């Protein structure tokens, strides 16, 4: 593993946003900036400094087995991972690299898969765990399928860690990350999520309120920051698999396995919602697999680093956008479908060529197979992509190895994961 390609986070780095816990879903739009990274230029400067200054790096390869995947090399080769679970929080990369989840709190063991009462959840249930005000690292006592009656509304500073067991959130409502900060979701199967709502749901020990109908996303990120979604398997939900909207930022989506879905990932609320210009999202080391159609992702306004992903299936297109997002595609592998009318990786919406030719979309070091092609636009200069750069890309020839274990892992205690 090349040390110059390891993202550095300095212990003395300037805090990028203020952290708040337990913000109720009834808060007004004017509070959304509380969780935003307010200065994307500052983030870009820190990332650039991190990549160039390898002498002061954080050593993600502490237990390295040199897979080439810096996240996995950080923790997976440690046979004692089960007793050192919280080390995972030191392994994030990209724009969501400062997400610590429940690292500084106690462990909470989920022992009950039921979700009988979304207003008064029982201790031992996942819902009871995620609504608490304190930081928590949430683990599971055994294999379980959790069918949620209503959205699982998370409070700040939580980690959901499915390693060591087989946990499915399926066949009901799924996960909502709204007006909160510092969330890690790792090692969960999320599928067959359905619209729910028009019901009372608790969001903290001191608050519950009326929830209108939810779309049926696998993971919905709304007005939140410092989010890391890693090593999950997602498929077949009613709306998106992962949606991030309403000035959400400082997000990393990594090592996930996406299958059997139409509109995979939406990043940005609407063309008219300009607050999404603060959005910075890293999409790294994911496998976009069989049965996918479009939106991998579909972007608006912000800055998006798409790096070292494996795109083996799409039916319409892979990466789309509108409202002048900056898209930095580096070191990905794009395998086009057989359909000769669907070879293009990219798609621009709601703009003529005279408009989108100014949008900064670049491809650098990508591998194109079976006739795949990426339509570039805007500036080709590196400086134009500073705010859409979050880590050093590896060679696209390594993508198959880097993404080989994408999705929820089969980890067992006492063994390398």
Swiss-Prot record:
Organism per entry: Arabidopsis thaliana
Catalytic residue list: 295
Family: Belongs to the polysaccharide lyase 1 family.
Biological processes per GO annotation: pectin catabolic process
Pfam family, one: Pectate_lyase_4
Name used for this protein in its record: Probable pectate lyase 20
Transmembrane segments: none
Enzyme class: lyase
Pathway annotation: Glycan metabolism; pectin degradation; 2-dehydro-3-deoxy-D-gluconate from pectin: step 2/5
Entry-listed glycosylation sites: 29, 53
Signal sequence range: 1-25
UniProt keyword list: Calcium, Glycoprotein, Lyase, Metal-binding, Signal
MF GO annotations: metal ion binding; pectate lyase activity
EC number: 4.2.2.2
Reaction it catalyzes: Eliminative cleavage of (1->4)-alpha-D-galacturonan to give oligosaccharides with 4-deoxy-alpha-D-galact-4-enuronosyl groups at their non-reducing ends
PANTHER family: PECTATE LYASE 18-RELATED (PTHR31683), PECTATE LYASE 20-RELATED (PTHR31683:SF120)
Lineage top rank: taxon: Eukaryota
Keyword set includes Transmembrane: no
Known cofactor(s): Ca(2+)
Annotated cofactor note: Binds 1 Ca(2+) ion. Required for its activity.
Residues that, per the record, bind Ca(2+): 215, 239, 243
């Amino acid at each position: 593993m090349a040390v110059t390609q390891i993202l550095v986070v300095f212990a003395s780095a300037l805090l990028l946003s203020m952290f708040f816990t337990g913000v109720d879903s009834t808060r007004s739009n004017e509070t959304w900036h509380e969780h935003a990274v307010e200065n994307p230029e500052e983030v870009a400067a820190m990332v650039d400094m991190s990549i160039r200054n390898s002498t002061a790096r954080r050593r993600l390869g502490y237990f390295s087995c040199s897979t080439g995947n810096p996240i996995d090399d950080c923790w997976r080769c440690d046979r004692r991972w089960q007793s050192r679970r919280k080390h995972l929080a030191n392994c994030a990369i990209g724009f969501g690299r400062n997400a610590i989840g429940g690292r500084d709190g106690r462990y909470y063991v989920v022992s009950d898969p039921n979700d009988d009462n979304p207003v008064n959840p029982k201790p031992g249930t996942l819902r009871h765990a995620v609504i608490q005000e304190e930081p928590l690292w949430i683990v599971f006592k055994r294999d379980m399928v959790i069918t949620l009656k209503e959205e699982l509304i998370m409070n700040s500073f939580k980690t959901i860690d499915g390693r060591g067991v087989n946990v499915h959130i399926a066949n009901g409502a799924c996960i909502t990350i709204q007006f909160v900060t510092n969330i890690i979701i790792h090692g969960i199967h999320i599928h067959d999520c359905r619209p729910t709502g028009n019901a009372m749901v608790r969001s903290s020990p001191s608050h519950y309120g009326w929830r209108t109908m939810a779309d049926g996303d696998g993971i919905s990120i709304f007005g939140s920051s410092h989010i890391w979604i890693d090593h999950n398997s997602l498929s077949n939900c009613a709306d998106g698999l992962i949606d991030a909207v309403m000035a959400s930022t400082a997000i990393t989506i990594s090592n996930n396995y996406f299958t059997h879905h139409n509109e995979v990932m939406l990043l940005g609320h609407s063309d008219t919602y300009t607050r999404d210009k603060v959005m910075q999202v890293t999409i790294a080391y994911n496998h976009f697999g069989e049965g996918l159609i479009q939106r991998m992702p579909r972007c608006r306004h912000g800055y998006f680093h798409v790096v070292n992903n494996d795109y083996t299936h799409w039916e319409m297109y892979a990466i789309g956008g509108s409202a002048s997002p900056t898209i930095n595609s580096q070191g990905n592998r794009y395998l086009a479908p057989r359909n000769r009318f669907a070879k293009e990786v990219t798609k621009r919406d709601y703009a003529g060529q005279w408009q989108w030719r100014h949008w900064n979309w670049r491809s650098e070091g990508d591998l194109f197979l079976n006739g795949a092609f990426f339509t570039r636009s805007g500036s080709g200069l590196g400086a134009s992509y500073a705010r859409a750069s979050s880590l050093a890309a590896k060679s696209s020839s390594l993508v198959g190895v880097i993404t080989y274990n994408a999705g929820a892992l089969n980890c067992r205690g006492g063994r390398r994961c």
